[in-house]
């Protein structure tokens, strides 16, 4: 049985809690430790809950080979061999310790997506508080088991996965002892067009698997992640770069610190606006109630000439009752402007 909330570095994550906002560093460090540290500081300043890394090397993902199926033929990275792309994009593993230490020092959670057992081992040495299974690794059941063995909360992205593949991964995690699991709806297109996102999958996935569900977003701008809050998402992950002009593998679809700050602000405003099921009381001055518009004497019979429905409201006789007052007698003398009450009638 999965819990309905995760606890990551002391922060509760789930549908009864504020959205957990993850700034995904990905390849935007540009293999520069100083730039990576800038991103950690900027994510904290923007209000993100976590900065997330990716822990792999070209050799742990693929092999150096010039056969045709190792060559990227389309998409944003076309014209490169896989090995060369990953060799350019990976974060040097020696960066991890300093980034984890910095994040802890300034008060932002740092965790990572491992891509093999050696990455899990490194992250365990750094006491990573949670793990993220990237979309392409959802079908790597051994990696899920390796992560599950740590006993930490697990977030799994589902880009490109069929419903049966997601169900298989969830079962593997459950059987391996994971009790804190979150799924992320994801579209593995870079950048992803809005009409490919299908946000209605979020509540469906939540119902299907009885776990918290959020969004790993690759669209441009904030519209889609903000909308995910309204359909019940509880986690938002977005790629994050210091400057869109940075020549990194992911910069062209990543958000800047200013955009991240705007996202965080927007999410928190929407969370306030979502509120709860609520209907207002009726004591509103902008509504109308029934008034006397002429002086009347005690015992006088009312006609249309005496009555009007108008503002301010708040009186006990609503406009719908006005017709029933015609022909009734008042039991006291009343001046024009009186907000009528039922006790005023014989």
Annotate the PLM regions.
Residues 1-346:
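Catalytic cores and adjacent flexible loops of soluble metabolic enzymes
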């Amino acid at each position: 049985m999965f819990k309905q909330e995760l606890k990551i570095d002391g922060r509760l994550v789930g549908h009864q809690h504020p959205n957990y906002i993850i700034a995904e560093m990905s390849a935007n460090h540009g293999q520069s430790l100083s730039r990576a540290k800038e991103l950690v500081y900027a994510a904290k300043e923007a209000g993100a809950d976590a900065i997330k890394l990716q822990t792999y090397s070209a050799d742990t993902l693929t092999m150096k080979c010039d056969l045709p199926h190792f060559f990227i033929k389309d998409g944003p990275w076309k014209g490169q061999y896989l090995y060369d792309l990953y060799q350019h994009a990976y974060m040097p593993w020696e960066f991890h310790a300093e980034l984890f230490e910095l994040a802890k020092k300034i008060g932002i959670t740092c965790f990572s997506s491992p891509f093999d057992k050696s990455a899990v081992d490194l992250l365990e040495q750094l006491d990573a508080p949670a793990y993220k299974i990237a979309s392409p690794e959802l079908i790597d059941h051994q990696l899920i088991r390796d992560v599950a063995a740590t006993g930490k909360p697990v977030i799994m992205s589902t880009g490109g996965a069929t419903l049966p593949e997601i169900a298989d991964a969830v079962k593997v995690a459950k059987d391996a002892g994971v009790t804190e699991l979150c799924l992320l709806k994801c579209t593995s297109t870079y950048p992803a067009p809005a009409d490919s996102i299908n946000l209605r999958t979020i509540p469906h996935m939540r119902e299907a698997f009885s776990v918290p569900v959020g969004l790993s977003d690759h669209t441009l701008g904030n519209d889609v992640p903000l909308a995910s809050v309204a359909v019940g998402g509880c986690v938002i992950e977005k790629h994050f770069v210091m400057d869109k002009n940075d020549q990194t593998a992911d910069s062209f679809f990543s958000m800047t610190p200013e955009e991240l700050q705007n996202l965080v602000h927007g999410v928190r405003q929407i969370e306030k606006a979502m509120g709860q099921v609520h209907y207002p009381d009726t004591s509103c001055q902008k509504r109308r109630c029934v008034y006397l518009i002429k002086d009347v004497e005690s015992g006088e019979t009312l006609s249309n000439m005496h009555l009007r429905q108008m503002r301010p409201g708040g009186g006990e006789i609503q406009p719908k009752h006005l017709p029933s007052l015609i022909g009734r007698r008042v039991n006291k003398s009343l001046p024009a402007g009186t907000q009528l009450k039922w006790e005023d009638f014989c």
